[in-house]
Curated annotation (Swiss-Prot):
<keyword id="KW-0812">Transmembrane</keyword>
<keyword id="KW-0407">Ion channel</keyword>
<feature type="binding site">
    <location>
        <position position="81"/>
    </location>
    <ligand>
        <name>Na(+)</name>
    </ligand>
</feature>
<keyword id="KW-0813">Transport</keyword>
<feature type="transmembrane region" description="Helical">
    <location>
        <begin position="76"/>
        <end position="96"/>
    </location>
</feature>
<feature type="transmembrane region" description="Helical">
    <location>
        <begin position="41"/>
        <end position="61"/>
    </location>
</feature>
<keyword id="KW-1133">Transmembrane helix</keyword>
<dbReference type="GO" id="GO:0005886">
    <property type="term" value="C:plasma membrane"/>
</dbReference>
<comment type="similarity">
    <text>Belongs to the fluoride channel Fluc/FEX (TC 1.A.43) family.</text>
</comment>
<keyword id="KW-0406">Ion transport</keyword>
<dbReference type="Pfam" id="PF02537">
    <property type="entry name" value="CRCB"/>
</dbReference>
<keyword id="KW-0479">Metal-binding</keyword>
<keyword id="KW-1003">Cell membrane</keyword>
<dbReference type="GO" id="GO:0140114">
    <property type="term" value="P:cellular detoxification of fluoride"/>
</dbReference>
<comment type="function">
    <text>Fluoride-specific ion channel. Important for reducing fluoride concentration in the cell, thus reducing its toxicity.</text>
</comment>
<keyword id="KW-0997">Cell inner membrane</keyword>
<feature type="binding site">
    <location>
        <position position="84"/>
    </location>
    <ligand>
        <name>Na(+)</name>
    </ligand>
</feature>
Length: 133
């Protein structure tokens, strides 16, 4: 990758990442206000939404030909990378354990991982259906 393409990719990732992080904040804030702080609904929601959209986008960018690289940087690496958050998932699990609510950790991890996997496959199926020539 030459220097110009590298810088273009970096700018696309930063732009998408800023938007994705802002979107994560908005979704998390709305769900916190609606459901309270008893369960990390915001992190769960953004990770499941991100899984679905990533599956869809993976198929969609493959259909873009040579422009697919730029779209991948902007939308998958940037936007979805900024929207979803593995570190928050782990921190929330630690908080549950430290607050003597460790039984919820297994439930939270199972839901996140199982539904995340399901959603990425569903998004890819939708992407294949929508992008089918």
């Amino acid at each position: 990758m030459n220097a110009v393409v590298w810088w273009q990719s970096l700018l696309l990732v930063m732009l998408g990442g800023a938007f994705g992080s802002g979107l994560r904040f908005v979704i998390g804030s709305c769900l916190l206000q609606r459901f309270g702080a008893g369960f990390p609904w915001g992190t769960l929601a953004v990770n499941l939404i991100g899984s679905f959209v990533a599956g869809f986008l993976l198929i969609w960018v493959d259909k873009r030909g040579s422009a697919g690289w730029s779209w991948r940087m902007l939308l998958i690496v940037g936007l979805i990378g900024g929207l979803t958050t593995f570190s928050s998932l782990m921190v929330e699990c630690l908080v549950f354990v430290r607050s003597e609510r460790s039984l919820i950790v297994g439930f939270y991890l199972c839901i996140t991982l199982l539904f995340g996997l399901l959603f990425v496959f569903l998004g890819a199926r939708l992407g294949a259906f929508v992008c089918d020539d």
